[in-house]
Amino acid sequence: MAGNVFGQMFRITTWGESHGRAVGVVVDGLPAGLPFSEADIQKELDRRRPGQSEVSTPRSEADSVEILSGIFEGKSTGTPISMLVWNSDARSSSYDAIKNTPRPGHADFTYIARYGIRDHRGGGRSSARETIGRVAGGALAKLLLSHYGIRIVGHVLELGGIRAKSLSFEEILENVERTPVRCADPEAAKKMLEKVSALRQEGDSAGGIVEVMVKGVPAGLGEPVFDRLDADLAKALMSIPAVKGFEIGAGFEAARMRGSEMNDSFLMEDGKVTCSSNNAGGILGGISSGLDIVCRVAVKPTPSISKLQQTVDLTTRENAEIAIKGRHDPTIPPRMVPVAEAMVALVFADHMLRSGFINPRTLLG
C-alpha cells in the first residue's frame, strides 16, 4: 500500500490501524535545534482524541504519545522523529457482524476492490484514527513555524446547516476552544450543539465546514506550476477522511462575482505592499502574497449511523440491510479542526524549507 508519505523536505509517514496495537508517525526533515517535548505533542493530540465531549465518540483513549527517536536534551537532532500512540480501547467484536456487508459511505467496498483484503475492525487503515500521526507531525510543524511568526487557527464555520458569523483571526483564536463544537461564535455554537444532540437521538449525523486561517505567511511561498501552494493545500486537506470539498479565499463564490468585485486592489501600507481585500485567500498564481491564508473544507456527515440502510452481502452476493452499531461521532467537524490545522502546518513547514525561508539543516545558527 503506497500513499502513506506526505511532503517533500518536511515529510511525514503515518502508520497503523484503528484496532491494531498502535498508530504513529515518522517525521523526517525537521531541522536540528528545535526545542520540543512530549507535552507539546500531547496538547494537540488531546484536542483530537475521542471521548472529549458529547459531540464525539465515547471510545475512551488517552492517546498518550511516546517519542522514540530524533530528540536529545530537549531539542531535535535533525534525524527522523518517530512517535507512537498505543490503542487501548478497541472493541473489535462490534464489527464482526458487518465483516461481509460494506457500510454505506465508508471505504469498506473500495478497499476490497483495491487490495482484495481489508481489516474490517473499525475501518482499519481507512479509519480517522490514522489522523493521530498527522496531528503529531503537525504539532512539530506548528512549533517550527511559530519560530518564524506563522500562526494557524481552525474553527467550525458551519455545522448541520447552522453558520457562524464572520470573525477575525484573533477572535477565533480566543474563543474556539470554549465550546465542544469548536465554533468561536457562542450563539451559533449553542444552536449547533442542539442540532447535533437532536440528530444523535434520531440515529443520524451532521456534516459541516471547517475553516483554517494562517497569519504571518511571507510573500513568495509556492512552486508553480504543479506544486502551487494552493494546490498543495487542497491535496493536504482533501486527504483527510470525510472531506468532500475545498475552497480558498472567495472560493466557489468567485464563480458568481464580477472581476471588479473579485480582484484585490494593491496598495502601500507602512511601506509594504498589501491589498484592500483578500478574495484570493492570500495566494496569487500559486504563490503566497503575504496576506492571511484563508481556506475551507466541506465535511460530510458521519457515515456510521444507526438508521437502517441498504447494502449488499459480499458472501451471498445478495442485497442486504445494515444498521451500524458501536461508538461513533455524531458529527466530524469539531474533532477535524486540529487535523485540518496539522495538515496546513505540514504544507507551510514544507514550503518554508523548500523556498529557503528556513535553514534545512539547523536552527542553531
Swiss-Prot record:
It catalyses: 5-O-(1-carboxyvinyl)-3-phosphoshikimate = chorismate + phosphate. SUPFAM superfamilies: Chorismate synthase, AroC. It is an enzyme of class 4 (lyase). Keywords: Amino-acid biosynthesis, Aromatic amino acid biosynthesis, FAD, Flavoprotein, FMN, Lyase, NADP. Coiled coil: none annotated. Its EC number is 4.2.3.5. GO terms for molecular function: chorismate synthase activity; FMN binding. Residues 41-62 are annotated as: Disordered. Residues 41-51 have a biased composition (Basic and acidic residues). Reduced FMN (FMNH(2)). One of its GO terms (biological process) is amino acid biosynthetic process. NCBIfam families: aroC, PRK05382.1. This reaction introduces a second double bond into the aromatic ring system. Belongs to the chorismate synthase family. This is Chorismate synthase. It comes from Methanosarcina mazei (strain ATCC BAA-159 / DSM 3647 / Goe1 / Go1 / JCM 11833 / OCM 88).
